[in-house]
Amino acid sequence: MSGLSDAEYHRLSDRVLSAIEQTIDRWLQEDVIDIDAQRTGGLLELVFPDRSRIVVNTQPPLHELWLASRAGGYHYRHADGLWIDTRDGSEFYAALSREASAQGGRPLRFEG
């Protein structure tokens, strides 16, 4: 488990979900891509034009963020201001951008 308090974890993980939603909203307004974002508590589901999905959800007991896409599932822990994959050390937004680009069929970039 991370060195975060529960309150800090919730604040940081909520910030991630909100940043993703804001990016999707901006893309819709700018007619970049039509991704449907549906948030229920700590789960955010992104539905792409081809009906494929990416799911980002919080895991409060573990202080992790999980990302699931067609390519697989990934677990992230907060360290040094970033969400880092527990297996390969990659950064969350880079992985989300890669997976969204693959499923969206065009370059898409998420930032925190």
Question: Predicted regions span which residues?
Answer:
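N-terminal intrinsically disordered, cationic/polar leader segments
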Residues: 1-112
